[in-house]
Amino acid sequence: MSLNLDKDNRDLSSNQGHLGEFRRGLENWPPGLVWQPDGEQIEAMVKLYQGVLVGNARLNLTRITAPLDFLEKHLWDSLAGVLLSDHSRNCPQARVIDIGTGGGFPGLPVALVWPQWSVALLDSTHKKINYLEELGHRLGLANLAYLVARAEAVGNQPQHRSQYDLALIRAVGEGVVCAEYALPLVKVGGTVVLYRGQWSAAEAEQLERACALLGGKVSATVAAVTPWSGAQRHFIYLTKEKPTPSDFPRAIGVPRSHPLGVEN
């Protein structure tokens, strides 16, 4: 699949109003995240939005395409998970992996805002990763890597296991499933960010039990309200305290079918 935004602009002629509304939203970025996009970042994010709209006409990248929804549920949410952590302030260099990136979130916005970080986009769907690679090149993002694989497989590969400073995982599965996918990939002392909507005490207890088996702990839970719709979001931060036992991650499909920490 070839990405040519000049050609594909014809397909977007009916969406010029959306692009304008999206740009205005960026130019009036809400306070609260101790970050504001500069002019170069605004232009890059408009191109990102445009590229996702083009890709969405061919692939099921995302159901979220309305300008303010995209700003809030993709850009704001993607960046909030990192900006509300210590990594945005204390890690001038970082190796990051976005597990189950789908349409490129949170990895693409993170790569745009932190060009000094190396960001790997991981997804099991070839067509999505192929398109994201073309979009990344169009955006000039030299700090991206692209992986087509299942998280369980990558977590057992020496070139990826315990190699990342930060793992981001959003809309992939239950919290305990996400922990089993992500903790094997980060270094001891590294951080996993789980992006969640509602978050219950029962889920928190299950996650604590799972993390204990995986060599990690829940270090923080941050609740936030989205700036446009007022929806509730939770960002769960896991810290890896010791190496994950070689038993984890388990075989492909097992973390989801038999989640850790869940009492039957």
From Swiss-Prot:
It is found in: Cytoplasm. Its EC number is 2.1.1.-. GO terms for cellular component: cytosol. S-adenosyl-L-methionine binds at G100, F105, D123, S124, T125, A151, E152, R170. It comes from the Bacteria. One of its GO terms (molecular function) is rRNA (guanine-N7-)-methyltransferase activity. The keyword Lipoprotein does not apply. Keywords: Cytoplasm, Methyltransferase, rRNA processing, S-adenosyl-L-methionine, Transferase. Its main location: cytoplasm. SUPFAM superfamilies: S-adenosyl-L-methionine-dependent methyltransferases. It holds the Pfam family GidB. Belongs to the methyltransferase superfamily. RNA methyltransferase RsmG family. Specifically methylates the N7 position of a guanine in 16S rRNA. This is Ribosomal RNA small subunit methyltransferase G.
